[in-house]
Amino acid sequence: DRSTHEKEIYCLASNMNPGIAEHCDEILIGNFNDPEFVVSYSKEAGITIAIIGPENPLASGVADALWKVGVKVVGPKKNLAQLETSKAFTRDLLKEYAIPGGPQYQTFDSMNGVASFLNDLGENYVVKFDGLAGGKGVKVSGDHLYSHREAIAYCKELVEKGGEFVI
């Protein structure tokens, strides 16, 4: 049976989207990656259920913070969102539980061992930034990287930015 309660839709967005706004009772432009801000807004608006779409708020713990204040959430908590947000976490999980499909890999946060591991792999490898990069953190040999020299240069860029990466 459908609920007879009146429904309201609130949206917390990073920018105004007229297509979404026309379906909402209220749209607020703000930092939906900030758990404190989202919780404050949810209390103010009387939110009882939240649907979180983007990965960034999941990675920053917004779902966890909402659950703590009694708001039901469609979207994983931070530790479960790591399956999508951390390449290293996912690869380690596949390895730990012997789940098929996990490629040979190593995780790096410095250049130590990078050249040697690339030599072991030959010409078939992928370098992935470990974290959220909006789809821009993956480079594939033959498509984006045409030599080990280019791969090493990309890895150096990631290290200089303070990033961890997976090969």
Predicted regions and their residues:
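ATP-binding N-terminal substructure of ATP-dependent carboxylate-amine bond-forming enzymes
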Residues: 1-78
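Glycine-/Pro-rich loop/turn segments that contact NAD(P) or position catalytic residues
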Residues: 67-71, 78-124, 135-144
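Short secondary-structure boundary segments
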Residues: 54, 129-130
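Glycine-rich beta-alpha junction loops
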Residues: 15-16, 112, 131-133
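A general structural signal for well-ordered alpha-helical segments in protein cores
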Residues: 35-38, 59-63, 87-91, 114, ...
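Glycine-rich phosphate-binding loop signature in dinucleotide/nucleotide-binding domains
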Residues: 42-47, 120-121, 160-161
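Conserved ATP-binding module of the ATP-grasp superfamily
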Residues: 100-103, 124-127, 141-167
